[in-house]
Amino acid sequence: MSIQEVRPNNTIYINNLNEKIKKDELKKSLYAIFSQFGQILDILVSRNLKMRGQAFVIFKETSSATNALRSMQGFPFYDKPMRIQYSKTDSDIIAKMKGTFVERDRKRQEKRKVKVPEVQGVKNAMPGAALLPGVPGQMAAMQDMPGMTQAPRMMHMAGQAPYMHHPGMMPPPGMAPGQMPPGGMPHGQLMPGQMAPMQPISENPPNHILFLTNLPEETNELMLSMLFNQFPGFKEVRLVPGRHDIAFVEFDNEVQAGAARESLQGFKITQSNSMKISFAKK
């Protein structure tokens, strides 16, 4: 289906994802590469076997979903190009915000599942007999079709964080890495992916290598690479053996390192960890 056939909305549907990636890691990585486009309300990854390699990212604003779709279409993610389109229908969370949410009739679905063996039994007892119109269960197979209106149970994630551009690409106009529109969080609380208030950091002379501190325990090389790879001149991330809370990020020159430092200073990878960035000592 072509992207243009579905009306732009807050939710993007992504498929062709690497099925070997664990669910938790997949959610964190999607979170890391898409949150720069705007506030993310949810990331949905299905437990259903038929929905492996697929996910939904729900943004607060439609414009954020549009920017994400245009910028990340075909981007190589875990060695597979992502295929992205708008979701065919609003997710539950967006429908509730719009006042259009309708509770699914789960009892009717369960009744259909129960009556399927009865219909099959009649057919087996009377070879060649046609099924009667309107008999519950004739369309039971349709229940397993994936989609937002009859979706399988989804894994839930709240929060956000930035993405990788193709080399040389710059963030969309007006969007700084990690920036998110004002959300509904109580005063003083930040969702993951938001910038914490700037705190004074001891200054070292400019350097092409950045020193990161206050990183959460789940930080890994891939996650940091996704955060910093969007900036021109990025070379590599170096973790410190035995230390999960610090890392080094190298750029081609001091100017490029400084730009990344300024943009990601105070970035919250998790609710409790605001990343601190300084120039490494020479």
Curated annotation (Swiss-Prot):
Localization per record: Nucleus
Cystine crosslinks: none
Highest rank taxon of the organism: Eukaryota
Keyword Ion transport in record: no
A Gene Ontology molecular function term of the record: U1 snRNA binding
Record protein name field: U1 small nuclear ribonucleoprotein A
Alphabetical list of Gene3D superfamilies matching this protein: 3.30.70.330
Function statement: Component of the spliceosomal U1 snRNP, which is essential for recognition of the pre-mRNA 5' splice-site and the subsequent assembly of the spliceosome. U1 snRNP is the first snRNP to interact with pre-mRNA. This interaction is required for the subsequent binding of U2 snRNP and the U4/U6/U5 tri-snRNP. Snrpa binds stem loop II of U1 snRNA.
GO CC annotations on file: spliceosomal complex; U1 snRNP
Gene (UniProt): snrpa
Domain RRM: 10-89, 208-282
Family: Belongs to the RRM U1 A/B'' family.
Gene Ontology annotations of biological process type: mRNA splicing, via spliceosome
InterPro entries: Nucleotide-bd_a/b_plait_sf (IPR012677), RBD_domain_sf (IPR035979), RRM_dom (IPR000504), U1A_RRM1 (IPR034407), U1A_RRM2 (IPR034409)
Subunit structure: U1 snRNP is composed of the 7 core Sm proteins snrpb, snrpd1, snrpd2, snrpd3, snrpe, snrpf and snrpg that assemble in a heptameric protein ring on the Sm site of the small nuclear RNA to form the core snRNP, and at least three U1 snRNP-specific proteins snrnp70/U1-70K, snrpa/U1-A and snrpc/U1-C.
Keywords assigned by UniProt, alphabetized: mRNA processing, mRNA splicing, Nucleus, Repeat, Ribonucleoprotein, RNA-binding, Spliceosome
